[in-house]
Structure formats: structure tokens, C-alpha cells
């Protein structure tokens, strides 16, 4: 058993030792803190030094970069506009039959006709899409391209699936007649101009609206001032030498022998072939355009008929009609 006096002295001695140790620890902290603070200050100063010039340089570099970006954007926009303006149109190859090639004496033997088609923007309204475009047509003659200016109108994108010469002739007839009748509406004497369109129908005894064929021939007393391609595309097919009928245009059509698919089967029989040739005679018919559509016009009595059967059965029929 220890006495309370010894225990009190021990506790007092421990407290004194602790009090002596505490100042030593404080001194170490005081000594270590100055050594740590300069490092922190140096790092902070170096970071601030490194950051301040960097911010200045980044601000200085941002200005030319923004200017360069704006210049690149403007150049890209200009290039896109120039590409849209200088965009080459599409090429459409249209085969030409030999009968039409023979008329092109000044161009020689042409292989095909290239028509430049304009790309149509579907976002634009129809009024803007249906405008006339003046482009060029390339006629390849003897491997030498010859440029011809043509004028055409496009409303929508289209294809031309040519199968035979019959479809080509019917297309030419439709295009020319539509162009002529549109010009005739501007004239005062429209009936006189419309009556100049004479068509000779093939096989009148077995005529149907689905089977007919026509061939263009040169009108009489007519002088051609321009080549065939330019006349067909510009709307002025020919010009008459008669000064009284100034700027009156005519398209004369002749009949040809057309044999249907049913009649082809009877060609092996001689009698059937003779019957086809026997009834193949020329019959002149005048077709005019009215507000109600196409009509058959009788040049003798001046009456109009809706069908060819009515024209044949009326009272003033004759072998030459």
C-alpha cells in the first residue's frame, strides 16, 4: 500500500512532465510551420504566375480564332452558293429515229440528242418550278459535238421511256400541236389557224383511239430559216412565204400503214395480207382544238364531230374526205 502523499507527488510530477513536453511540441509546430508556409506560398505564387499569362494568352488567341472561324464560315457559305449556281444540270439521252436524222443534213448523222435538264427544288412552289429555262442541247454528229440553244419548260421531274418509233412520232405530234395551238390562241383569227392542222389517218375502217400513227412531212411552199432541232424546240416549226398570212405556222401529217398485233397473226396468210393492203388508202381528216377538246372537222360542210365514225357517216362524205 502506498501512501497518499506518494501518490500525490507522483501525479504532480507527471503533470509537470506533461507541461514540459507540451511547450516542446508547440515549439516544433512553430518551427515546422515556417518551413511549410514558404513552400505553399511558392506553389501558390508559381501557380498564379503560370495562370495569369495563360489567361492572357488564351484571351489573345481566342480573338484570331473567332475571326478565322467566321472567315471559314463565310467561305463555306460562298462556296455552297457558287456550287448551287454552277451546278451542272442532268443529261437525258433521247434516241432519234433514222427518218428524222435524214432531215438533219447540216449536222450529218446524229446518234442521239442530249437535253440538259434542270434540277427541280421540290420545296419551291409550282409557279417557280414551271418557269422556262434557256439551256443548250448537244447534237453528236460524226463524233463532233455541236451546241444548239433550245428552250423548254419543266414542271416536275420526268422520264422518257421510248420503246418504238410510233411512240416517238406520237410524242412529237402532241408536243408540236400543243405548242401551235397555244400560239394560235394569241392570234385573232384562231379558227383559221386551227384549221391548218391536217392529219391523214391510217386504216379508217378499223380506226380506234388507241391505235393510230402519224408521220411529219415537209409542207408545200415553205422556207426553213433555222435547223430542225431549233425549229422544234423554239415553237416556230416553219415560216410561210405568203406575206398575207404572216407568221402562220402549219404542220402537215401523212398516213402510214400500221398493223396491230391481231393483224400480225394473219400476215402469214396471203389473203389476210392482201386485205390489209386493200383497205389502206389515204383519207384526209382535219382535227381542230376547241374548248370542249379535240374535234373532227369536215372541210366540205364545216361541221364538227366528236368521233371519226360520225364524220364518216354524215351526209357529205366523199372518197377524198
From Swiss-Prot:
Identify the domain of life: Eukaryota
* Designated name of the protein: CPX chromosomal region candidate gene 1 protein homolog
The family database entries (InterPro entries) matched by this protein are listed as: Znf_C2H2_type (IPR013087)
Chain ranges passing through the membrane: none
Bias category Polar residues: which stretches? Answer: 21-32, 44-60
Organism per entry: Macaca fascicularis (Crab-eating macaque)
Q: Which residues form a coiled coil?
A: none
The annotated region (Disordered) lies at 1-83
Amino acid at each position: 500500500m502506498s501512501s497518499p502523499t506518494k501518490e500525490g507527488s507522483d501525479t504532480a510530477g507527471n503533470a509537470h512532465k506533461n507541461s514540459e513536453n507540451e511547450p516542446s511540441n508547440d515549439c516544433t509546430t512553430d518551427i515546422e510551420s515556417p518551413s511549410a508556409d514558404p513552400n505553399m506560398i511558392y506553389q501558390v505564387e508559381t501557380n498564379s504566375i503560370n495562370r495569369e499569362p495563360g489567361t492572357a494568352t488564351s484571351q489573345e488567341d481566342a480573338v484570331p480564332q473567332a475571326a478565322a472561324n467566321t472567315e471559314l464560315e463565310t467561305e463555306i457559305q460562298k462556296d455552297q452558293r457558287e456550287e448551287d449556281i454552277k451546278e451542272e444540270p442532268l443529261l437525258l439521252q433521247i434516241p432519234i429515229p433514222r427518218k428524222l436524222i435524214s432531215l438533219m443534213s447540216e449536222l450529218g448523222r446524229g446518234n442521239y440528242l442530249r437535253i440538259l435538264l434542270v434540277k427541280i427544288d421540290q420545296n419551291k412552289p409550282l409557279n417557280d418550278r414551271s418557269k422556262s429555262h434557256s439551256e443548250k442541247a448537244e447534237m453528236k454528229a460524226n463524233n463532233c459535238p455541236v451546241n444548239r440553244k433550245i428552250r423548254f419548260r419543266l414542271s416536275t421531274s420526268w422520264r422518257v421511256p421510248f420503246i418504238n418509233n410510233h411512240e416517238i412520232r406520237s410524242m412529237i405530234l402532241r408536243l408540236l400541236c400543243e405548242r401551235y395551238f397555244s400560239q394560235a390562241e394569241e392570234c385573232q383569227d384562231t379558227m383559221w389557224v386551227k384549221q391548218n392542222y391536217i392529219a391523214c389517218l391510217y386504216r379508217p375502217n378499223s380506226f380506234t383511239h388507241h391505235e393510230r400513227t402519224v408521220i411529219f412531212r415537209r409542207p408545200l411552199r415553205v422556207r426553213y430559216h433555222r435547223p430542225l432541232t431549233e425549229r422544234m424546240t423554239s415553237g416556230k416549226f416553219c415560216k410561210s412565204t405568203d406575206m398575207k398570212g404572216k407568221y402562220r405556222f402549219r404542220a402537215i401529217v401523212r398516213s402510214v400503214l400500221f398493223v396491230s398485233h391481231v393483224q400480225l397473226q394473219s400476215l402469214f396468210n396471203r389473203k389476210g395480207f392482201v386485205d390489209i393492203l386493200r383497205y389502206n388508202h389515204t383519207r384526209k381528216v382535219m382535227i381542230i382544238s376547241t374548248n370542249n377538246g379535240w374535234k373532227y372537222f369536215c372541210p366540205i360542210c364545216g361541221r364538227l364531230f366528236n368521233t371519226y365514225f360520225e364524220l364518216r357517216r354524215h351526209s357529205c362524205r366523199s372518197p377524198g374526205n
